[in-house]
Design a protein with these regions (language model features):
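Phosphate-binding and adjacent anionic-ligand microenvironments
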Residues: 6-192
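Cysteine protease catalytic core and zymogen-processing segment of caspase-like enzymes
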Residues: 1-4
């Protein structure tokens, strides 16, 4: 996309690995992190006139020669097209993408939506005192060589969490900080 499009903006959601941003920038693109949710990504793509976007969930959107919505068959065909234009294998193409250590998406149930939003407000105040944070969607806390994301679920009374580090040691360290704070909320079920 970056080779053929005049618009270099690529939209991706807050749950994506730091490798996404790094790869976009290395390839000459403009990385725009946005809120999680396929409709939110699509709307941001329209606003930015972006030809490509994606989410950690696997929703991938092409808008350069297509309608700008997620379509697995179309994405597969575009991948086949890319592979047909090179002598490299898919493994060789993606071999330069950095690899990080991360948790799967974790969900911590709250009693109700009100508690979910109260906890998120408190988490934001707590972490912003100590760390650099992004509040695009929830709170993304940058700790050492990684980050922890805490956000209110769009569909349930739950806090959604994802953590990433450059190494297993970094990941474990960030998990300890995030989980230590989450454990102070007596009504949140923390199971991991």
């Amino acid at each position: 996309i970056l080779k053929i499009s005049d618009n270099k903006k690529i939209i991706y959601d807050v749950k994506c690995s730091a490798a996404v941003k790094e790869t976009i920038l290395k390839s000459g693109g403009e990385a725009i992190e946005w809120k999680t949710g396929h409709s939110l990504i699509k709307n941001k793509m329209k606003l930015e006139k972006s030809d490509f976007g994606g989410e950690m969930s696997g929703h991938i959107f092409f808008a350069d020669r297509y309608y700008g919505y997620d379509d697995a068959v179309y994405v597969s065909l575009r991948l086949i097209e890319i592979l047909s234009e090179t002598d490299l294998t898919l493994s060789e193409i993606v071999s330069d993408i950095p690899s990080y250590f991360s948790t799967p998406e974790l969900r911590f149930e709250c009693k109700n939506d009100q508690e979910k939003f109260n906890v998120m407000k408190d988490l934001k105040e707590y972490f912003e005192k100590e760390y650099t944070c992004s509040t695009i969607d929830g709170i993304k806390v940058f700790i050492g060589k990684g980050w922890g994301l805490l956000r209110a679920s769009n569909t349930q009374p739950a806090i959604v969490c994802r953590i990433e580090g450059e190494s297993q040691v970094e990941l474990d360290s960030i998990k300890k900080i995030i989980f230590s704070k989450l454990s102070t909320y007596k009504d949140i079920k923390i199971e991991f």
